[in-house]
């Protein structure tokens, strides 16, 4: 009988401790502010999505904390990622939306990297970010085939070497032999759009959803200022049915299998989307609260109505899905990494 009483007492005590811990974790966020860093400058799609999510996320977190968005551009997003990994307190109050292709910097051994990609805490992503490469219509070459023999290569913008905006044009060079002059150092999509308007650049890659659904590109399309050349997804985006995928282009040009594998590694960053990540060692209970809140926020009728009004498409990834992808993508054979180094490091 004593053993039974002891067992019951233990279970009751365990349940009480668990209940207190649960209550404590839910009370933690009350009266506090969560800082959401953006690894890009203001005015681009990454910044817009961060501010969009921030409007709705807080009310689905117990305690209804404020969500404060702060831009931290630099080194193509590495600055923000390094900060989150090494400096931000792992207390559940600091997170960020960062460039999903930063894993490529780690794979090729970039000296600037001070993080281990799979060890971040992963909360979720509101959309996948397959890209479309678009160019000003006043550029003389009208097609990819014509660009092969262009008298002057087009100038194409990107924030840095780690990112689909850089990967897609460079993969065209690798697969088709098209020469493209990359212009790096832009803080985000807003700066690149302004440079395109001024004629500083001819082309850039951006997300397919932003290209058809956001300004200024939505108006540019209507006015015939730009045209789409190729998109990065495995399938054609429904709103760009006449624009070939890069995979279709590779098949049509009988691209070698080694180049196809390189393309798959680089373009898969689109599956990570616009990941919300946090510092390693963030308490698991707080991570789960934030993951649950993200899922609830993404189904909030007010958010869905706002997204529809903006003509934005949601394509969610859970924190668990992002975590699995992040771990998988870091396991690459030496020959792929060497090809990546050649593509991303050689000028």
Each model region followed by its residue ranges:
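Bacterial N-terminal signal peptides
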Residues: 8-18
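Hinge/capping helix and adjacent helix->loop/strand transition within the periplasmic-binding protein
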Residues: 34, 59-61, 83-94, 102-200, ...
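Short helix-initiation/N-cap motifs at beta->coil->alpha
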Residues: 72-80, 183-198, 209-213, 320
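Extracytoplasmic "Venus flytrap"
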Residues: 35-50, 73-76, 157-164
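Short beta-strand-to-loop elements that line the ligand-binding cleft
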Residues: 66-74, 157-159, 180-188, 206-207, ...
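A ligand-binding cleft/hinge motif common to bilobed small-molecule-binding domains
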Residues: 100-112, 166, 170-175, 198, ...
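An extracytoplasmic/periplasmic, membrane-proximal ligand-sensing/linker region
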Residues: 30-32, 222-223, 248-252, 261, ...
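Short beta-strand->loop
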Residues: 118-126, 179-185, 216-269, 318, ...
């Amino acid at each position: 009988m004593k053993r039974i009483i002891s067992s019951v007492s233990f279970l009751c005590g365990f349940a009480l401790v668990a209940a207190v811990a649960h209550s404590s974790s839910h009370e933690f966020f009350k009266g506090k502010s969560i800082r959401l860093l953006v690894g890009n400058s203001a005015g681009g799609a990454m910044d817009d999505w961060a501010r969009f999510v921030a409007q709705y996320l807080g009310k689905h977190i117990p305690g209804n904390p404020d969500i404060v968005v702060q831009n931290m551009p630099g080194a193509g997003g590495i600055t923000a990622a390094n900060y989150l990994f090494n400096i931000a307190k792992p207390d559940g109050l600091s997170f960020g939306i960062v460039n999903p292709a930063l894993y490529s910097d780690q794979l090729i051994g970039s000296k600037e990297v001070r993080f281990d990609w799979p060890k971040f805490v992963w909360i979720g992503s509101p959309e996948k970010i397959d890209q479309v490469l678009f160019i000003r219509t006043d550029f003389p070459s009208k097609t990819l085939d014509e660009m092969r023999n262009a008298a002057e290569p087009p100038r194409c913008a990107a924030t840095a070497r780690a990112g689909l905006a850089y990967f897609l044009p460079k993969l065209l060079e690798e697969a088709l032999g098209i020469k493209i002059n990359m212009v790096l150092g832009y803080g985000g999509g807003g700066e690149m759009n302004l440079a395109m308007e001024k004629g500083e650049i001819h082309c850039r890659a951006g997300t397919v959803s932003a290209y058809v659904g956001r300004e200024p590109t939505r108006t540019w399309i209507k006015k015939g200022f730009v045209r789409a050349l190729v998109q990065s997804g495995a399938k054609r985006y429904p709103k760009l049915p006449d624009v070939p995928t890069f995979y279709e282009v590779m098949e049509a040009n009988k691209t070698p299998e080694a180049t196809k594998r390189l393309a798959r590694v680089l373009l898969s960053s689109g599956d990570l989307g616009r990941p919300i990540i946090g510092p390693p060692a963030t308490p698991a209970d707080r991570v789960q609260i934030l993951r649950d809140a993200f899922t609830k926020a993404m189904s909030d009728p007010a958010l869905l109505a706002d997204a529809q009004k903006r003509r934005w498409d949601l394509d969610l990834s859970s924190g668990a899905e992002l975590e699995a992808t992040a771990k998988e993508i870091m396991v690459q054979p030496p020959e792929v990494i060497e090809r990546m180094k050649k593509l991303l490091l050689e000028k």
